[in-house]
Amino acid sequence: MKRRISIILIAMISLIISSNLSVMAYELPHAFWGLDAGYSNATSSKNYDETINYGVQIINLISSEPKNEQTINILGSRTYDVAFAYFMNGDYTNAAKYFEMYIPYGKQLGWTDGVIIAENCVKQFTNTFDVYQATEQSQKVYGAKNEPNGVLYGQVADKAKSNESMTLLYLEYGDESTFGWTRAMLDKAETQNKAVEIALNFPQEGTTVRNINGSDSFLSDLRSMLSTYKNVPIYLRIGAEFNVWGDKCTPDEFISAFKAVANSVSGLSNVATVWSMAHTSSWKTNDWPYTADDFYPGDEYVDWVGVNCYASKYFQGRVWQGESRYNEVCFKTGYSSDPVVMIKDAVEKYGGRKPIMISECGSAYRTNGDINETDSEWAAKYLKQIYTFIPMVYPQVKLIAYFNAKMNYEVNYYNLDGDSKLQNAYNDVTESPWFIQNNNTNSAGQFFKKAGSTITMNGDTTLYAYPHIYGSDWVNVEYYLDGELVKSTLK
């Protein structure tokens, strides 16, 4: 099941550095001091226009000066503040420009939090527009275990539909009481020729990890059960979302546990191991200074890499005002819910050598708490993006599983059967030809290839577009042939 995640919020960092540092044999230009006085007044009063005005002048002035501790501090703080001022003013293009300018200074100065914020803002604020062309050939083949020819899709086992090509079920490590139900679901999958993603959760998270040694009866009994389903492609997802656990563990502890589970099913030709992360990690701290990548067990133990993809209109069920809005950017909610950007790091890091699955996904139609809002249109829009843009942009992704369950204690509800517009959006988009229908051994009827500056075709062709424009509720794409408008996405 989807877990409640605890994420450490950070207070808004202040990067305003005193300009009165003493540096031997160097004096700041005389013009700096007047500009700095105006800049200080602007930042203290949160006058973003004047922060930009004075900040840009200071950046231009100091950029031509020798690089030393003082000038680097000035450039680091001013580029960050100018970027944030553009962010607050809604000028995301210039915000991205100055955040990108800030990053090398922030790294040099050890301003880790600022660098994380800046890198996320650059990813979100940079506009992207790519065109794709329909093709009959897969654009990425790994030769991996249980690799399909297209994109498998499905949902939790108790809601599965006959036309879906995979199903998702859950086991809790150490608990064999559900093995009977698991066998029943595997029997059903075998009869219907569905692939199965088994989410082997670690119920006590880090505590469970520390108690796994590979010699307990649970693992031997699990292997025995899975070995009887040789005709069912099984994706064993081991200890998922480790990077947002409340009861944390170290990378060494997790890797040891993962290897123990992976070794227990090695040699089973139908079982592929899956290492699966949450799309965004808990914030780094002195006590937990890790990224998801630190927990990777190694290629020899991992057949597939998974990542979750949950679209939520509000981060932690609240509205973030003013400068605290960076939380929405860093934790990928609201306008930052673009699924392509959400999983970008995972695909780019591992998709060159491992097939990728969206091991769980959902689009929130309901936000509880102080928000108390239902927005079916928003949820349907982002569900369609998950199921269209991800297969379009990332041929590395070969499985998408929807978490069709309602967790009453969660801030957000994602269940398809809780909202008719969301359910209809799922039904419609999963009929698309890039999904494998019914039997998991079938092939998709269509794939995507990225179009170049010139499109060559013999007869008809189908074009698709992926636009990413931060802060836009809707984007209209127009297609022209020989200067004539032939199609608009709004018509």
Please place each PLM-identified region on the residue numbering.
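Boundary/entry segment of secreted carbohydrate-active catalytic domains
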Residues: 28-36, 117-181
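Substrate-binding cleft of secreted/luminal carbohydrate-active enzymes
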Residues: 114, 128-155, 234-235, 354-446
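Aromatic- and acid-rich polysaccharide-binding/catalytic face
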Residues: 162-172, 292-333, 357-359, 363, ...
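Substrate-binding cleft of extracellular glycoside hydrolase catalytic domains
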Residues: 175-279
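Glycoside hydrolase catalytic-domain groove-lining segments
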Residues: 182-197, 201, 310-368
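Aromatic-lined carbohydrate-recognition surfaces of secreted/lumenal glycan-active proteins
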Residues: 262-291, 350-367, 397-405
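Long, low-complexity serine/threonine/glycine- and acidic-rich segments characteristic of extracellular
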Residues: 446-491
